[in-house]
Every structure is written in C-alpha cells, then in structure tokens.
Amino acid sequence: MVLLLLIAIGIVLLIGWRLPLMGSEWSKQTIYVGLLDAWHGGSTDDKAYAMWIDDDSTEGVFEVKAIADEVGIKPAFAVIADRMEPAVADSIASWQKQGAGIVLHGLRHERWKDWDESQIENDINLSYARLHEQGFDTTKILKLIIPPHGCNTRIIRRVIARQGCQMISGASLVNPDRHVFQFGRIGIGPDTDLDAMRQMLQKAYDRKAFVIFSTHSSIPEIFSAEKIRDVLRMTKEIGFCFEPYQ
C-alpha cells in the first residue's frame, strides 16, 4: 500500500502540472504517455511552441479558419480523407497552400484498435491517395498521425513509426517538446477553465514545452468559438510560437 502511494505521488509530481485540469483527465493513456515523456526529460526546443488542430473536417472548418485568421495563426486540420464534402475538401486544400497544416486522421474514421499492421498501413496509404485526388499536396502533409477514436496499441505505434511520423495520442497532456514520439493534446470546449489554462500555459512556457490544442468543430455542442479565441490569444500573449509545425 505504501509503495502504491509513493508511485501515485511520483506520477503527480512528474506529470501533474501538464494536465489541463488537475484530477480531471487521469486516463490510463494519459498516465502512460506522461510517464514516457518524463523518461524523455526536459525540452530540447529553443522556445515554447503551440499548435491548434481541429478534428474530423466537416463544415465547421470554416469557423475554424475564421477564428485562426482573426487571432493571426495558421490552424491544422485532422482530415478524414474519404468523408469530406467537396466544398470542405476544396477549401482545406486551398488553405494548405496558404500554410494550414494537414494531419492524417484515417480514411473513413474506422477504429484501428483491432486491425493488423497491413490493414493500418493500407488505410494510411489510401488516405494519402484520396487526399491527392482531392487536390492536396501530399508531399506537405504533416508527419503527424491521429489514430481514429484515440486508438493506441503497440501495432498502431509500430506502423506510425515505420511511416516516419509522430503520433498524436488520446492523452490529455502538455508535451515536453516537439521531439517525443507520442504527443498529448489539450481540449478546448465550453467548460474550459481559463484561469486554470493560463496557469498551465505559463508553466509550459517556462519549460519551453509544446502544447497542442484540440477541438472538434464537427460537434457543435463541445465547440466554443469564444473559449478558443480566448485560449489562443492568451497563448500568444504569454509568448508561445505558433510557427508551422515541420
């Protein structure tokens, strides 16, 4: 019992400051990725970086682009390659030419959890092909992959690593820097506590950490344009660099 208590205290000390709200996101995946990051050590980046990724690529992307333009940053879109309406695909492809980031999020958003390596690889390859058909520059797609539904298995990680990409996991964490394999991301929604967010961001900035913000404009009830603007402006005010991810 004492050993378990010491382990729990150790986990809190190692990754507690990197959670969006203390005690609210202690999922198994968050703890797992957080401990891996702790092993990685401190930041090797020259400054603190931030990035905003919106998932699922539906009509909500137009509001995302408007917010990004208003705040003065380049957004990134986690696209479901074969589920975009033509107007959405055409718009995101044109925004890519203006500097928006494109992240793979599956061909049809099917769960990879129970798939074998060949099935996952095929899904990734078909995603690239489908995006190329829709006018995307596949040579400039970010080397980041978000497995659909937050799936995270050894097989998925192995395939993504073999693709020469980094993985954005379902962990809700600030990242130590831009060089770890598995990234966490911080959700922004209607219930986001701005004071708690500012405290976390200040600590992240002081440590030259890398923050990925996550939204789902495809789900209006958990999408808050007001909170997103507030958080992004706050992040810029603190001093984070939104330089496009390479």
For each of these PLM feature ranges, what is it?
Residues M1-V12:
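N-terminal Sec-pathway targeting helices
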Residues V12-L14, P20:
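Hydrophobic alpha-helical segments of integral membrane proteins
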Residues V2-L4, A38-H40, A89-S91, M200:
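Short, well-ordered helical secondary-structure segments
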Residues V64-A66, V88-D90, W115-E117, A196-R198, ...:
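Surface-exposed beta-strand edges and their flanking turn/coil or helix-capping segments
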Residues P20-I53, S57-E63, Q134-D137, C151-Q246:
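C-terminal active-site subregion of NodB/CE4 polysaccharide deacetylases
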